[in-house]
């Protein structure tokens, strides 16, 4: 089974991921992974850290002469900011009082993590809880995208809202997914409509002046996914559940919906479901996609559509702070302040692409085998033909 573990602290020496179950005979380049890492770092409203880090990956195992071996793949991304934190984040030696965090930030892992793991210096919590961890998720996601793209599956994302500033749904319904993606790639905020950046940037600038941070909503999709990934047979084999968990695991994500999601609760049954049609050329298909490509916990051949809501980042600017309590003195105190973003919704959308890619790649390998990619592709092609002939 395809799986990965990652490790590393936000200001430690490096971030590492080990991927197990990745098939052999897949062509891999660091350039492809680095391209995805660069996409994660883009976005108007990001903090000063993005000016320091220019993430690039090192492959330490599992690849020889650009071809995967079927053995575990080890990826490393060095933290360039580590040189400024060597004393504070030293592996060995005596502890230091420098840059201690004693006032937990509401909305972050600080306080609960400190209680759970027995630390008063909450830096021991926030360093791992930080969204910097998603760097390796994107690197792993790049490997998964390589598999998916080789069998015609395309994954993308775009931002629908930041704070109260929204893209009207009617504005994008007539635009193809390809154009939405291309527009998002050329937007500093991953907006699917051209010409909207400036008004959104002005809104973000105002939030910065007010010392605020902003959340938002993004949409991630997958096209040309085969019918029948996932299963209705057990609660934990339903693919919509796996996708929702993967997206919810991204820092600051507080809500996920698939297809029309919560809107379906307001519709009568006659308007909520996607009617079924058939043609010899297309096989079975739908004219609508309210289900978001998933029925009964399985893919139905339509595009997978997932939306996620990201809360505002808990770290506020220095001239505005939330009320907290010092964990040592128990006295009221302003919450700790760290260098942070005003908004990271565009970056979260890219991370969500990677998580969706991982879940789909894992399902593909579970259904069609996971040893040799050359053989796996042959099975997938035959299966697609069987589906068309059904």
UniProtKB/Swiss-Prot annotation:
Instruction: Name the PANTHER family on file.
Output: CHORISMATE SYNTHASE (PTHR21085:SF0)
What InterPro entries does the record point to? Chorismate_synth (IPR000453), Chorismate_synth_AroC_sf (IPR035904), Chorismate_synthase_CS (IPR020541)
Q: Which cofactor does the UniProt annotation name? A: FMNH2
Q: Indicate the enzyme's highest-level EC class.
A: lyase
A Pfam family that this protein carries is Chorismate_synt
Pathway this chain belongs to: Metabolic intermediate biosynthesis; chorismate biosynthesis; chorismate from D-erythrose 4-phosphate and phosphoenolpyruvate: step 7/7
Xref: SUPFAM superfamilies: Chorismate synthase, AroC
Q: EC number(s)?
A: 4.2.3.5
Query: Keyword NADP, does the record have it?
Result: yes
The organism named in the record is Sulfurihydrogenibium sp. (strain YO3AOP1)
Assembly and interaction partners: Homotetramer.
Q: Which Gene3D superfamilies match?
A: Chorismate synthase AroC
Q: Which residues bind FMN?
A: 128-130, 251-252, 296, 311-315, 339
Return the protein name.
Answer: Chorismate synthase
Which cysteines bridge via disulfide bonds?
none
MF terms from GO for this chain are: chorismate synthase activity; FMN binding
Show the catalytic activity.
5-O-(1-carboxyvinyl)-3-phosphoshikimate = chorismate + phosphate
Which GO BP annotation is one of this protein's? chorismate biosynthetic process
Q: Which residues bind NADP(+)?
A: 40, 46
Highest taxon in the source lineage: Bacteria
